């Protein structure tokens, strides 16, 4: 399975309202519930007014379009990383999953996954 590195520093943040969001940005994940509006975006694209934010994330995505019937893809990746004390934060689109890892552990995470047979694509 191929994993594609995302060539950006990312931030996870919380915003007060939808008015803070700029949907013209290329890399933007929005989660909205009755309790909060969360955003994952390129660090340079973080809205000016955030309630909270956590910088220092990097990401890779699972290459290709994943069929909804596939089972265990994220479980295998998360198990490999958890066994090596590397935490993850995952966001998904209709097509695939994006795995975020803190910047200081990102290269170690990719090395571990490569050792387990994953192909890392630039």
Annotate the PLM regions:
Residues 84-99, 105:
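A cross-kingdom feature marking solvent-exposed beta-strand/loop segments within repeated
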Residues 1-84, 108-122:
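Regulatory modules associated with amino-acid/nitrogen control
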Residues 36-41, 96-102:
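A generic structural motif
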């Amino acid at each position: 399975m191929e994993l594609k590195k995302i060539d950006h520093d990312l931030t996870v943040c919380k915003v007060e309202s939808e008015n803070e969001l700029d949907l013209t940005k290329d890399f933007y994940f929005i989660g909205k519930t009755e309790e909060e509006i969360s955003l994952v975006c390129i660090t340079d694209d973080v809205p000016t007014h955030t309630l909270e934010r956590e910088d220092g994330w990097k990401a890779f995505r699972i290459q290709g379009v994943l069929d909804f019937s596939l089972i265990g893809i994220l479980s295998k990746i998360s198990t490999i990383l958890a066994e090596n004390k590397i935490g993850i934060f995952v966001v998904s689109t209709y097509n695939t999953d994006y795995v975020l890892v803190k910047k200081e552990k990102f290269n170690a995470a990719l090395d571990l996954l490569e050792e387990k047979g994953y192909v890392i694509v630039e």
